[in-house]
A protein has these predicted regions:
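N-terminal lobe of the biotin/lipoate ligase/transferase fold
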Residues: 1-157, 167, 211
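Conserved phosphate/anionic-ligand binding catalytic regions in large, soluble enzymes, centered on
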Residues: 94, 168-182
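Solvent-exposed residues in well-ordered beta-strands and their adjoining turns
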Residues: 108-110, 166, 179-181, 206
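Proline-centered turn/helix-capping motifs that create local helix->coil transitions or kinks
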Residues: 138-139, 183-185
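C-terminal accessory segment of soluble enzyme catalytic cores
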Residues: 148, 184-235
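Histidine/acidic-rich helix-loop-helix segments that form or flank divalent-metal centers
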Residues: 160-163
């Protein structure tokens, strides 16, 4: 069973969290490079981490995304009190804000499995199992990443959790964003994930009431450990 350091960062500026991810990821990458250069020397261990947080209002665009999917100019961003970043994860554009649970697993997949598609499916399954505990049936929507509701009905299918990751030398960063008590009106300012014919939803919207974020995080952590055969240790 692999040990993974867990930390809840609380409400944190997006850039600050991104820089933290970069630092942790780069540390592990450099350890792996050093180990390969000197295989006869004592091998250093990489550290896997799971970070949870919320962000102030921010739109992020992945490396394969289009600026056309941001429907605001610079003044518009100021009007809605939001920032914007072009970042190095996969995927298109999404929104992060208070009430949304963002998870950043920074894992050395060499210690788990070296299959990025399996990794994404495990993240999706973690969220699917968590939502089930709150009485919400969800699943995967063919052709798209993330977690969706009403996946059998194209007219009603709606996304509740977005995903976008980056992997270098099997070290992951970025991750998932689960809409819990999220202000969904912000999604009107973008074409979420570049998909213009599907809606977004949240746990609050589906249940008709706000949800305890700590309970959702506890469930996510439990299913993360089950799927990845990991032990979370508070950092």
């Amino acid at each position: 069973m692999q040990k993974v350091l867990y930390k809840n960062l609380g409400l944190i500026d997006y850039k600050k969290a991104w820089e933290l991810q970069e630092r942790f990821s780069n540390e592990s990458v450099q350890i792996k490079i050093g180990n390969r250069k000197s295989p006869e020397a004592s091998q250093k261990e990489t550290v896997s981490r799971l970070l949870f947080c919320e962000h102030p209002n921010v739109f992020t665009l992945g490396k394969s995304g289009s600026f056309d999917n941001l429907l605001l100019d610079e003044e518009g961003l100021k009007t809605v009190d939001a920032t914007f970043y072009k970042i190095n994860r996969g995927g298109d554009i999404t929104y992060h804000g208070p009430g949304q649970i963002v998870g950043y697993p920074i894992l050395d997949l060499d210690k788990f499995f070296t299959d990025i598609h399996k990794y994404l499916r495990f993240l999706e399954e973690m969220v699917i199992r968590t939502l089930s505990e709150f009485g919400i049936e969800s699943g995967r929507y063919s052709g798209y990443t993330g977690v969706w509701l009403d996946v059998e009905n194209p007219l009603k299918a709606r996304k509740i959790c977005a995903m976008g990751v980056r992997c270098s030398r099997w070290i992951t960063m970025h991750g998932f964003a689960l809409n819990a008590n999220t202000d969904l009106s912000y999604f009107k300012n973008i074409i979420p994930c570049g998909i213009d014919d599907k809606q977004v939803t949240s746990i609050e919207k589906e249940l008709g009431q706000k949800v305890d974020l700590n309970k959702v995080k506890k469930s996510l952590k439990k299913h993360f450990c089950e799927l990845f055969e990991a032990e979370l240790v508070d950092a």
